[in-house]
Regions:
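Active-site-proximal helix-loop elements at catalytic-domain edges
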Residues: 13, 22, 61
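Intrinsic low-complexity, disordered N-terminal segments enriched in polar/charged/small residues
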Residues: 7, 24-30
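Nucleotide-activated sugar donor-binding and catalytic core shared by glycosyltransferases
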Residues: 7-10, 43-431
Length: 431
């Protein structure tokens, strides 16, 4: 019988050759058994009974989500070679083999007041996503961060009877702990990437899965990681002065509210070269309005290389703060938005944690200085940047804090570990 099974398996992923099937039956079966095995083989090879490829629908709404989703997709394809992947995201997801329905640069909206102004657009995007998922009918929908959008999407996915996996928890521990009830109701499996999130969800009796942080993978596997400062300068046509990197974010609102304040530092440090880390979703035209009075170079597609070679960095709050820490470049964390005093009041009212940067949250103490809202001004930026640009106590303490954070994050390989977990969990849903 083992020979028969081996022959049948040959046909699993190939067009059915009926004459050869009959030959197998005649060669390996006799008498009454011949009829039984013929029936079993034809049933096994019938198209509707053959194993269908798994269909994964992935939704990421910003550059960091695009990065993590792309590495997750690579892991899914490694362990499930026939996987079909479709979703909302960016260029990195597309390069990893995902069919992109809508790019995140057309959907990303941030800030309290900006969201209120764009409610109609948000509703239209949710409905478009809804219809596409129903039409494609995936085996699972994997939501990646981007809680404001994805938790709304999760509601109708659940109603449609499609398993909902959440990869990279929305930061409800910072903004809205009340959403835990919603997550418990709508999300079948939660996969978190920060160790403190395991304890957070445990307080609400909601088990989650943790396998490390995918940023460690992305940075560990980055190209040019052995590049020297002089090589980087030569390739990019820079002056050779020490570099101060400006990581101003990947969304237009971030450029509008943060980049102009970062650029006030240019005149204070003539012995350094300021370089903007160009976001993949942006073009020169997006940066041009802010560079009319200052001469600053923009380098696209090399953020890790730039930050690694920089003497210091000014970084918009978010994933980039942790990336900068893993790369061991001293930084000042920057965050601002429209609305002035009103936004600051809303910010202080709704933020539930002591720190906003991931570096400080993971460390459980202040490792990097955070300049938020009204505190993000020229005077404060000058003071904090001056403290870390040269050798000294502040710089040394920050680098030591980075070492603590990196130890807590653990080893590389998280993306593949999460992919394996998801495939195993999904197999349980399929029975």
């Amino acid at each position: 019988m083992s020979l028969l099974v081996g022959q049948v398996n040959f046909f699993q992923d190939k067009p059915i050759d009926l004459p050869r099937v009959r030959g197998i039956c005649n060669r390996y079966t006799y008498g009454y058994g011949k009829l039984v095995y013929r029936f079993q083989i034809f049933f096994y090879l019938c198209p509707k009974n053959r194993k269908k490829p798994m269909k994964y629908y992935v939704i990421a709404g910003e550059a960091s989500g695009d990065l993590h989703a792309s590495n997750l997709i690579k892991g899914l394809r490694k362990f499930d070679s026939g996987a079909e992947v479709r979703g909302w995201g960016g260029d990195l997801m597309r390069e990893s083999g995902c069919e992109i329905v809508r790019h995140y640069k057309d959907t990303a909206i941030m800030g309290f007041l900006t969201v209120l102004k764009n409610l109609d657009k948000i509703k239209a995007n949710i409905e478009a996503c809804h219809q596409d998922i129903l039409a494609w009918r995936p085996d699972v929908v994997i939501l990646v961060d981007y809680g404001g959008f994805n938790l709304r999407v999760a509601k109708f996915i659940k109603e449609a009877g499609i398993p909902v996996f959440y990869y990279i928890s929305p930061k409800i521990w910072a903004w809205n702990t009340g959403r835990v009830k919603k997550i418990k109701r709508l999300v079948d499996r939660m996969f978190v990437i920060f160790p403190f999130e395991v304890d957070f969800y445990a307080r609400y009796d909601y088990p989650v899965q943790y396998a490390g942080n995918p940023l460690v993978d992305a940075i560990h596997d980055r190209p040019f990681k052995d590049e020297t400062f002089n090589e980087f300068v030569r390739v990019n046509g820079l002056s050779g002065k020490p570099i101060i990197a400006l990581v101003a974010g990947s969304r237009s609102q971030e450029l509008k509210h943060v980049l102009p304040k970062m650029l006030t530092m240019v005149k204070h440090f003539p012995g350094h070269e300021f370089v903007i880390a160009g976001a993949p979703s942006m073009s020169d035209a997006d940066y041009a309005p802010y560079l009319q009075d200052v001469k600053v170079k923009i380098i696209y597609g090399q953020t890790y290389r730039l930050v690694r070679q920089a003497r210091a960095a000014l970084v918009t709050s978010g994933t980039a703060t942790l990336e900068t820490a893993i790369l061991r470049t001293p930084q000042v964390v920057c965050y601002s938005g429209e609305g002035g005093a009103l936004s600051y009041f809303l910010f202080k009212t709704f933020v539930k944690v002591k720190y906003i940067s991931l570096v400080n949250l993971i460390a459980g103490r202040e490792v990097v200085t955070e300049l938020l809202m009204q505190k993000l001004n020229e005077k404060n930026l000058l003071r904090e940047l001056s403290l870390i640009i040269s050798e000294g106590e502040k710089r040394d303490q920050m680098l030591a804090g980075y070492d603590e954070v990196n130890e807590k994050l653990g080893d590389a390989g998280a993306s593949e570990r999460f992919a394996r977990m998801m495939i195993d969990e999904l197999s349980r849903f399929r029975g």
